[in-house]
């Protein structure tokens, strides 16, 4: 829950969502696992800084300001890291570091799954209309742990029903074999959702809102994934989906989660719930 302690930590954070220290840590990790092939290659720190600016401020790739790397270079490196699986590995690495910093085991046992529909600008690529949310765009499918740390993310057209989105999370779930329980909302009550959880060795727990309750209600466990979605509003480039490809769209969300996780490691918030 959001408490006075959380508010104090939030007010004490740096003005920028991404600090140079977080950018440097991400760049150093990438250099260790994917060393530059040439001494004249663009420094990874410059690449990550340009990508962070693009995600933080928003706008077209061509809008990267003078003084940062060329937009084609930034986009090319993002596609390269996406194709090689480095972004997914980096997301898992940061998630493990955050769990250790919170006093937890590296392998989570509880997963919280939810979706978020966002508008899509007029670009090429698949999209759809979410009749429930009245949104024309795409749907983000999030897999987070008990603290709201991002474990995996997938992107599907917004017209895909929530109960049909779990298949998109299969690669992300397979990367975390320690998961044993999944918390979902009432949109995942279909038998195919239970079958998906059973297939991956997880027990399904559906947390639904009481129809008699009015207004905003904090739901058990589910509030952490809503908070994770809420933190994305700090990234101007993620307020609307701008990517022409679904995998690039997922990579942009994953990179924002990595940079936010790196910043949280520098200035963490207190965690009250110690359940994994």
What function would you assign to each model-found segment?
Residues 1-276:
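Short alpha-helical elements
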């Amino acid at each position: 829950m959001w408490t006075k302690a959380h508010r104090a930590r939030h007010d004490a954070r740096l003005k920028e969502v991404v600090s140079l220290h977080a950018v440097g840590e991400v760049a150093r990790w990438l250099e260790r696992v994917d060393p530059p092939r040439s001494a004249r290659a663009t420094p990874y720190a410059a690449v990550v800084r340009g990508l962070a600016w693009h995600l933080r401020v928003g706008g077209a790739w061509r809008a990267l300001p003078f003084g940062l790397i060329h937009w084609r270079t930034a986009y090319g490196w993002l596609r390269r890291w996406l194709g090689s699986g480095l972004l997914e590995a980096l997301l898992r690495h940061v998630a493990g570091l955050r769990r250790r910093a919170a006093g937890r085991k590296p392998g989570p046992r509880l997963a919280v799954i939810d979706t978020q529909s966002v508008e899509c600008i007029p670009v090429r690529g698949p999209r759809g209309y979410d009749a429930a949310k009245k949104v024309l765009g795409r749907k983000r499918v999030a897999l987070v742990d008990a603290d709201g740390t991002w474990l995996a993310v997938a992107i599907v057209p917004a017209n895909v029903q929530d109960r049909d989105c779990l298949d998109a999370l299969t690669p992300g779930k397979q990367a975390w074999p320690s998961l044993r329980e999944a918390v979902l909302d009432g949109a995942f009550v279909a038998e195919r959702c239970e079958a998906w959880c059973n297939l991956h060795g997880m027990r399904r727990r559906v947390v639904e809102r009481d129809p008699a309750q009015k207004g905003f209600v904090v739901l058990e466990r589910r509030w952490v994934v809503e908070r994770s979605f809420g933190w994305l509003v700090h990234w101007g480039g993620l307020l609307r989906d701008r990517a022409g490809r679904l995998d690039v769209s997922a990579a942009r969300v994953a990179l924002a989660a990595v940079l936010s996780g790196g910043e949280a490691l520098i200035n963490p918030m207190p965690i009250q719930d110690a359940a994994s």
